[in-house]
Amino acid sequence: AETLFRQWFIEDADESWEEKKLGDLLTITSSKRIFYSEYVKSGIPFYRSKEIIELRKTGSTNSELYISNERFREIKDKFGSPKEGDILMTSVGTLGVAYRVRKSDEFYFKDGNLTWFKDFKGLPSSIVYLWLISNIGQEALESIKIGSTQEALTIEGLKSISFKIPPKECIEQYEYEFQIIINKIEFNHNQIRTLTQLRDTLLPKLMSGEVRVEG
């Protein structure tokens, strides 16, 4: 997907393409604040930068923090929650690590450390995501960072980034190709998740002798 994106939208980019600010193409925001007293032992995973980085690298993560299902539903009903195609990006300390939310994901996240890209207007999130993780996107992020002791990306800074808009027919064809790739990746992640759960269930039983392998 990254190779396809680079060829279509960077190497073959046309100077005549319309240029807009990122803030005009989508909503850039953060989450509602969750307080320490609201953490629970199980429920809906609550992600920080650490978990988003793990998801980006491996496709899975083990959440250490949770909020209750009731609190999550309350927030989701009033303000929304990350859904398929949305993008979360690390914005404090480790900058610019982006993760595109999958259909199977259900979680909430820490305000301040992560920035939420949603409500894409006429431009698929797949294109924005691959631009963010491309060299040209990372250079744009580098140019707007603030701070010296602890670097950060601000919502206003992200909104100000210029973005070239490919022609509609180019976007539609790319989105079709991209979705095929994403479906394959999602299938592989589900397979890995199933096998991991099976391993975690069977291994203790094998070690304790509860389950025996004949042969």
Regions found by a protein language model. Give the residues of each.
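C-terminal hydrophobic structural anchor segments
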Residues: 131, 139, 162-166
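Low-complexity, Lys/Gly-biased intrinsically disordered segments
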Residues: 15-60, 69-78, 95, 146
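A short beta-sheet element
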Residues: 48, 69-137, 147-149, 154-155
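A generic structural signal for short beta-strands and their flanking turns/coil linkers
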Residues: 43, 63, 110-113
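Short, charged, solvent-exposed linker or helix-capping segments at domain edges/interfaces
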Residues: 58-60, 129, 173
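Non-catalytic DNA-recognition/assembly elements of restriction-modification systems
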Residues: 1-36, 41, 160, 164, ...
